[in-house]
């Protein structure tokens, strides 16, 4: 047997070296690919459950726990607001709320503050001073007396730090108003309601809850997986459509909020307007959400069943998965 030539041995060594080199390069390339934003979206975040006792201790109030989230709500009982002769009470959308959700750095908050025109500037300044963010300022009503605005805030950090920041903002509202909004009595009474709620449920396709004369639907979007900074935004956290009815069968009022994907916006507006319901605001609530979501506030006065038909027509312009009683979501 002839000995293996030098050139043949060199070829074998070169082939082995090439295989090892390209195999290692491929693995390194794969590692590099996983370092971008896309990897962050798919990365499993390790989060600790919220310690609700910390929130309660710092804020000095109790909230409601739901599927790992904790929400505090402050009814604005010190504000006496009317629109077109209808009294707007907290159940009709006159309530400040802040939701806490567990996140990788401790907690993420989202909230909606009810503010008077005099509150707006000092509360804005306090939010920025605390290192929180403002993501939306808008109205819910028109022709309302006095005029009220709604300001959305957000932030994240350790649970204790975030709760302390929220406390500072809520304390600023008390300071400017000259008292605790929840302790007032101006909006703390029931409104008249003689509506046929069964007929409303049949038309709208959902069941609602009655609170002090306000019959309110809260409808989630289970067809949309919404995230803000990697944290899931739920119905409980404000990702929902709602409608609040009061009054009599022939003279009712409905106020509410629609949540919409961008392509649904013109369709929902058209359906509401064609049914005589005023669209009073179109806006965002968040700025880093995925996918992009818009919100719309509306106000209608008239025959209760006709208003419900208008609401149903607008709902039909959103996800078809959301159009049956099986998808019912009760009020948060």
Positions of predicted regions on the chain:
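Bacterial N-terminal signal peptides that target proteins for export
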Residues: 2-12
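Bacterial N-terminal signal peptides
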Residues: 11-21
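Bacterial Sec-dependent signal peptides at the C-terminal "C-region" and cleavage site
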Residues: 22-29
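Long, contiguous binding/interaction regions
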Residues: 29-147, 154-293, 299-332
């Amino acid at each position: 047997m002839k000995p293996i030539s030098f050139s043949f041995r060199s070829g074998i060594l070169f082939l082995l070296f090439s295989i090892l080199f390209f195999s290692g390069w491929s693995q390194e390339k794969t590692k590099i690919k996983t370092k971008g934003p896309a990897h962050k979206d798919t990365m499993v975040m390790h989060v600790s459950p919220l310690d609700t006792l910390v929130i309660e201790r710092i804020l000095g109030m109790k909230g409601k726990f739901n599927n790992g989230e904790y929400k505090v709500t402050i009814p604005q009982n010190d504000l006496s607001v009317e629109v077109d002769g209808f009294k707007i009470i907290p159940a009709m959308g006159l309530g400040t709320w802040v939701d806490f959700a567990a996140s990788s750095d401790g907690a993420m908050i989202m909230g909606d503050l009810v503010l008077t025109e005099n509150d707006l500037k000092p509360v804005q300044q306090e939010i920025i001073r605390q290192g929180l963010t403002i993501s939306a300022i808008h109205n819910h009503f028109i022709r309302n007396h006095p005029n009220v605005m709604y300001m959305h805030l957000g932030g994240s950090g350790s649970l204790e730090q975030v709760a302390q920041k929220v406390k500072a903002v809520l304390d600023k509202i008390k300071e400017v108003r000259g008292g605790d909004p929840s302790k007032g009595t101006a909006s703390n009474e029931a409104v008249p309601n003689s509506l046929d709620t069964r007929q409303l449920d049949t038309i709208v396709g959902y069941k609602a809850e009655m609170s002090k004369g306000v019959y309110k639907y809260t409808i989630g979007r289970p067809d949309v997986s919404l995230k803000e900074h990697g944290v899931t935004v739920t119905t409980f956290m404000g990702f929902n459509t709602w409608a609040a009815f009061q009054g009599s069968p022939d003279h009712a009022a409905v106020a509410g909020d629609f949540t919409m994907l961008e392509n649904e916006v013109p369709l929902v507006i058209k359906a509401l307007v064609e049914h005589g319901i005023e669209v009073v605001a179109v806006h965002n609530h968040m700025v880093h959400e995925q996918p992009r979501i818009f919100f719309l506030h509306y106000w209608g006065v008239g025959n209760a069943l006709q208003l419900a038909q208008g609401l149903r027509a607008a709902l039909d312009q959103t996800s078809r998965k959301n159009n049956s009683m099986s998808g019912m979501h009760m009020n948060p």
